[in-house]
């Protein structure tokens, strides 16, 4: 079966609402919120991971036990109460699960990891983790020691029931029979199945697979049936009890065999609506045969986001970026540099592990280990998508080989000899290379290049293509016709816990691309008034103010610190540069305290805000009405101006939303509370839940007249969406004038205003009150 159509009797939700479950918002809080979500029009509550995680974890992706619901998140009692409430209200539940890794920040909290460290390769949990014991001389390397650390900072604790090694607050187990009278901590450490090493040594010596480069998240081997069963028994118990109807798979690209994993999961949960957090590059499709409904929606986000940009503006935006910042590198240059940086540093251990596997498989290969490692690095750097799934994606490997050989002709021989090994599906070499390319792409591009190439940062979004620009309504329609045919049950989204910016920040950033000299002149003055050693980073900072507006200075300082360290040009996480960082923080302070800079920014923010509202409502309507299952990220039914995590995981004021929704007695005005966005969201979600038959097809509706390019309109089979795009250009050109569209046969009512329409509708009338219209057929 093609992905996108569930082969089972899965109950596909009409929409989902994502909640971040944690200590300060446990499952009981979700249960209390359920009636509001039901009133909003949602059909499924979509939960972040709820299995036991590292104590205090705000996100829950660092699972320490698969056996139970996290007590901090409300425990089994909280889960059952939420399940009962959801059932009572007719709501489904979707859970987020993490098959790729476990949290090992504190070994004492993770029984499987503790026993692995204590008993080594003979541990009953040795098959759980992906450890290269040979590379560590039979020991697992734990890069937890500080810069100046040595064995003499370790201490021996024999006060408990079993002896432990201590390094400050870190605790480690001791193998039986390895403590002799008079031993110091260093003597005991030398006899363990693990070796504590300085954190900087991880780049070369790390010998267990991690989630990306996060030492505290150890990869697990769900490809082993026993590990799959043990790590999924609890989740499948919820499914069997009828408490869970949907599953979201975190990071499938980390798995050794994603297709095999998904087959096993779909067989164990045949009635579940399954989506995968898979990021596809432009033009890339989900692998055929995956038994899933689709992705978690980053592909849809990109289709909607680019609609807010005018392809005709790209040349000017690029030219002015180069002039303002002095950065004349292309997006492709930034991708190459970002990927090479991480492949040579934080993910180099993965390259070395594949190199060892190559040497083991082909001892007589006529290339040095150094050449093999460099050839593997070049192939990974040149890989055009996150990963292949051999034999699917074989052409990606060939293309990467061509590119790699053209960049490093002296490695052509090694590259050519590696190709048969890398394309031999199911072998250790092939699998590890596929796992590595995804990590190198994520860290080198999303977490590095996205912070360096700052031409129009609203396009630097997960699933997006910062090197592309806008798209036309015709291109959008083509993508939706394909989506309706191939992925009608895939999730769609505009904001997640992983997006670089919330949808409403991006809506305002899109306005900057329309402003032309009004924006570039302001940016020039800001860059001059508060100098930062990197003008490209300064340009990112001032765009961030324009997009987020006057958020608290604490939030902006925290964002600036994360962004400049991710960019790793001038400062970084490992070796922060005090001078560079002080200059950036000074610029942030001056935005709030310096009268000239503050008023420059304030005038800009005030000017773009109404057009930002227009873009916010347009993209929301398009996302909620387009083919797929729309997700609403917690709180984003009102305007929410959030930056990258942890900023986008702040507590949500649900009481405000509840009161606004209950208090509606008609269409609210367009203003700063965002009530209009809540009104729009609730009208469309309720319609999708109550009249699914009106959302079964996709027909582009041609807009004609002088401002035709400023609208996008489509009919889903009885529900019609009409949205404004490029509002600045529309106003400058004199408004809608006699632009209009021919409604499909029948009589329609705009669910947002209550107005009746039929036949040819003039957009000046249709969009008089709001920049959007949502019409349903009444006859």
Please annotate each region the language model reported:
Residues 57-70, 108-110:
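Surface-exposed, active-site-proximal loop segments in enzymatic domains
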Residues 384:
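An anion/pyrophosphate-binding glycine-rich loop and adjacent beta-alpha core
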Residues 2-55, 67-72, 80-88, 118-120, ...:
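Carbohydrate-interacting/catalytic domains
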């Amino acid at each position: 079966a093609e992905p996108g159509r569930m082969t089972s009797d899965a109950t596909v939700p009409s929409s989902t609402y994502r909640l971040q479950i944690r200590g300060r918002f446990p499952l009981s809080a979700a249960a209390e919120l359920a009636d509001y979500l039901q009133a909003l029009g949602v059909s499924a509550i979509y939960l972040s991971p709820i299995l036991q995680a590292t104590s205090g974890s705000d996100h829950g992706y660092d699972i320490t036990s698969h056996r139970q619901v996290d007590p901090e998140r409300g425990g089994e009692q909280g889960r059952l109460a939420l399940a009962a409430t959801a059932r009572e209200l007719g709501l489904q539940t979707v859970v987020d699960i993490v098959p790729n890794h476990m949290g090992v920040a504190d070994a004492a909290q993770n029984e499987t990891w503790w026993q692995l460290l204590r008993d080594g390769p003979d541990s009953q949990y040795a098959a759980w983790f992906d450890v290269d014991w040979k590379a560590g001389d039979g020991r697992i390397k734990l890069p937890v020691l500080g810069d100046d650390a040595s064995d003499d900072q370790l201490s021996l604790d024999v006060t408990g029931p079993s002896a432990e090694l201590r390094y400050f607050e870190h605790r480690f187990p001791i193998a039986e029979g390895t403590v002799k009278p008079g031993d110091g901590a260093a003597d005991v450490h030398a006899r363990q199945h693990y070796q504590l090493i300085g954190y900087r040594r991880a780049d070369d010596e790390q010998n267990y697979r991690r989630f990306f480069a996060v030492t505290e998240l150890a990869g697990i081997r769900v490809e082993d049936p026993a590990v799959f069963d043990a790590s999924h028994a609890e989740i499948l118990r919820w499914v069997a009890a009828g408490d869970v109807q949907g599953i979201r798979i975190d990071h499938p690209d980390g798995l050794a065999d994603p297709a095999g994993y998904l087959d096993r999961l779909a067989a164990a949960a045949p009635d579940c609506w399954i989506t995968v957090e898979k990021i596809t590059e432009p033009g890339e499709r989900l692998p055929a045969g995956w038994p899933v409904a689709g992705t978690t929606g980053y592909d849809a986000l990109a289709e909607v986001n680019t609609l807010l940009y005018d392809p005709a503006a790209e040349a000017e935006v690029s030219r002015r970026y180069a002039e303002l910042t002095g950065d004349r590198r292309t997006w492709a240059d930034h991708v190459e540099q970002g990927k090479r940086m991480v492949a040579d540093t934080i993910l180099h251990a993965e390259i070395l592990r594949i190199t060892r596997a190559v040497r083991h498989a082909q001892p007589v290969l006529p290339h040095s280990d150094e050449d093999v490692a460099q050839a593997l690095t070049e192939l990974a750097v040149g890989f055009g998508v996150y990963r292949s799934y051999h034999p699917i994606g074989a052409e990606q490997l060939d293309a990467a080989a061509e590119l790699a050989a053209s960049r490093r002709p002296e490695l052509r021989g090694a590259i050519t000899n590696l190709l048969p090994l890398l394309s031999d599906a199911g072998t250790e070499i092939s699998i590890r290379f596929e796992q590595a390319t995804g990590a190198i792409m994520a860290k080198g591009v999303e977490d590095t290049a996205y912070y360096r190439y700052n031409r129009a940062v609203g396009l630097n979004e997960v699933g997006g293509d910062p090197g592309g620009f806008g798209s036309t309504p015709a291109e959008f329609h083509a993508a939706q016709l394909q989506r309706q045919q191939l992925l009608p049950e895939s999730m769609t989204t505009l904001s997640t816990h992983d997006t670089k910016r919330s949808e409403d920040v991006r809506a305002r950033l899109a306005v900057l691309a329309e402003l032309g000299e009004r924006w570039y002149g302001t940016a020039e003055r800001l860059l001059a008034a508060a100098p930062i050693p990197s003008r490209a980073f300064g340009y990112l900072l001032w765009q961030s103010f324009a997009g987020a507006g006057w958020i608290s200075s604490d939030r902006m300082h925290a964002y600036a610190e994360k962004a400049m360290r991710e960019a790793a040009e001038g400062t970084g996480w490992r070796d922060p540069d005090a001078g560079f960082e002080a200059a950036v923080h000074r610029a942030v302070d001056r935005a709030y305290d310096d009268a000239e800079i503050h008023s420059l920014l304030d005038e800009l923010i005030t000017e773009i805000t109404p057009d930002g509202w227009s873009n916010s409502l347009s993209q929301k309507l398009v996302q909620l009405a387009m083919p797929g299952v729309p997700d609403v990220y917690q709180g984003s039914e009102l305007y929410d101006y959030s930056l990258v995590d942890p900023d986008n995981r702040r507590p949500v004021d649900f009481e405000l939303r509840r009161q606004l929704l209950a208090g509606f007695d008609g269409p609210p005005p367009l203003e700063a509370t965002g009530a209009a966005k809540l009104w729009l969201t609730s009208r469309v979600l309720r319609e999708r839940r109550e009249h699914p038959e009106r959302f079964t097809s996709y027909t582009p509706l041609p807009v004609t007249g002088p401002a035709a390019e400023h609208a996008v309109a489509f009919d889903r089979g009885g529900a019609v969406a009409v949205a404004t795009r490029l509002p600045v250009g529309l106003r400058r050109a004199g408004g809608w004038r006699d632009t209009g569209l021919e409604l499909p046969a029948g009589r329609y009512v705009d669910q947002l205003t209550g107005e009746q329409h039929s036949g040819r509708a003039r957009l000046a009338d249709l969009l008089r009150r709001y920049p959007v219209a949502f019409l349903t057929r009444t006859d």
